Swiss-Prot record:
It comes from Pseudomonas putida (strain ATCC 700007 / DSM 6899 / JCM 31910 / BCRC 17059 / LMG 24140 / F1). GO terms for biological process: cell division; cell wall organization; peptidoglycan biosynthetic process; regulation of cell shape. It catalyses: UDP-N-acetyl-alpha-D-muramate + L-alanine + ATP = UDP-N-acetyl-alpha-D-muramoyl-L-alanine + ADP + phosphate + H(+). InterPro entries: Mur-like_cat_sf, Mur_ligase_C, Mur_ligase_C_dom_sf, Mur_ligase_cen, Mur_ligase_N, MurCDEF_pg_biosynth, UDP-N-AcMur_Ala_ligase_MurC. This is UDP-N-acetylmuramate--L-alanine ligase. It is an enzyme of class 6 (ligase). Its EC number is 6.3.2.8. It is found in: Cytoplasm.
Amino acid sequence: MVESQKAMPQPKMGRIRRIHFVGIGGVGMCGIAEVLLNLGYEVSGSDLKASPVTERLESFGAEIFVGHRAENAATADVLVVSSAINPANPEVATALERRIPVVPRAEMLAELMRYRHGVAVAGTHGKTTTTSLLASVFAAGGLDPTFVIGGRLTAAGTNAQLGTSRYLIAEADESDASFLHLQPMVAVVTNIDADHMATYEGDFNKLKKTFVEFLHNLPFYGLAVMCLDDPVVREILPQVKRPTVTYGFSEEADIRAINVRQQGMQTHFTVLRRDREPLEVSVNMPGNHNVLNALATIAIATDEGITDEAIVQGLSGFQGVGRRFQVYGELPVEGGSVMLVDDYGHHPTEVAAVIKAVRGGWPSRRLVIVYQPHRYSRTRDLYDDFVQVLGDANVLLLMEVYPAGEEPIPGADSRQLCHSIRQRGKLDPIYIERGVELAPLVKPLLRAGDILICQGAGDVGGLAPQLMKSPLFAGAKQEKSK
């Protein structure tokens, strides 16, 4: 039974009044800050530079400091930090000296989830899209969920929102094992892949055990929703001592997809569920990986009693998430135009999924990728996979690695990647020097009908809007909101 919308009583955190975020502009921090502002807390935060994110929070009443200084935290009752913050940060040092609690962002998220029906989405890939789909379907079902997402939900114009119902939908971050703070009622595991292995001391078995531990944070009456198509998820399934529902393309899955048809940006498929009528579904996203994300959403929505009509409406009306195969528009070139796409994918599995989606939706079009590796350690650890996957583009331009605070690692840079990809003999990648303007470099390489993807988790995210505004692409047509 879907509950009626009632304003949910909002619990208070004891003596806590003023909450300070160190690195408030970060994608994992700003959403929690926004929800706390809407709950009536005083929120302040610091970051190295102002941004549209910090300006948005400021407009809601947050006090924003540019730069990290000890005095910024002086009046806080608690500091919230991410794993990216150095323990020597002056604000953290001041808080510790004054015995002001310093908590990880996941612990604050867990506090928000404590008195709610929490739905936590975990997995190496697909967390943001699945969480966003859930928010869309729950809203279509007459629920008004609180959500905290690692990307900007296009329809809401934000990555977080305070709802009136008991539901809180959030991403569960395995990168620093902080998802172990969460105690949800429903947990999703989309997949388990080798990433952030420094957290797990390079031990993949430790990573798998941590996911099992996360699932055992569920109460005995909770629900684990697990992707049966992922071999590692399938492997840990017998270890999970909680009620489970599986999904995937596998005939063994409780909820599965058949008859998948992709037409450009739209994917249509039939959903089979045990003891239910088949359900015809469409999503405005390409690729089988997004079918899996939709199946996880359908599994939870079905369990929560959301009607099939609302499920179909929430999925078909979903307008996407920022930087997840986000179509910016059309760039004019001789004889026609090029579709410009921005994408966050920064792991070989994610890059491969995007390439497969493009080949499936636009089989006759060339694929031009501007790729920026993210972190030297990831480039080193997954080097051979990157060489294999990136070599499947028709044209490849490689930006230098975005360090994300890391020091360079010999042999794990983009020049070396170019060399290794070139040696495969399939294509000759172009290395982009730091500071080089992209538009003059990429325009001569483009042909009418191409798909140009700017991909990665670093500052490559600013390239698509730059290209749309470049005089070399005068007359570029912005993608209209759906």
